[in-house]
Curated annotation (Swiss-Prot):
It comes from Bos taurus (Bovine). It comes from the Eukaryota. Coiled coil: none annotated. GO terms for biological process: angiogenesis; cell differentiation; macrophage chemotaxis; negative regulation of inflammatory response; positive regulation of ERK1 and ERK2 cascade; positive regulation of macrophage chemotaxis; positive regulation of monocyte chemotaxis; positive regulation of vascular endothelial growth factor production. Keywords: Angiogenesis, Chemotaxis, Developmental protein, Differentiation, Disulfide bond, Secreted, Signal. This is C-X-C motif chemokine 17. Residues 1-22 form the signal peptide. Disulfide bonds join 74-102, 76-109.
Amino acid sequence: MKVLISSLLLLLPLMLMSVVSSSSHTGVARGQRDQRQASGRWLREGGQECECQDWFLRAPRRTLMAAPRLTKPCPCDHFKGRMKKTRHQRHHRKSNKPSRACQQFLTRCLLESFALPL
């Protein structure tokens, strides 16, 4: 019984990685596909990379600490702060959830941290 449970726990990260990797490329334009790289790095337009550990070592959310070697921000660095709403903007509120690029970056980082070395 213990062997069965332990083998299932070992296979779970592999199944998650295969599901995420197959679903991340469906419906994506060819030009956007080149922006992604494996191993937790996010290739930006300038050719610089943002790594998972760089992001998780930063200060808490909404207090951005720019690393001195990075000139462009990571996908999750862009945050639109709360601004005073005018009459027309009150009805079109955006939620404070991160962008799609940031969500993809963070899920990739979390999956890599769960993956066990084989």
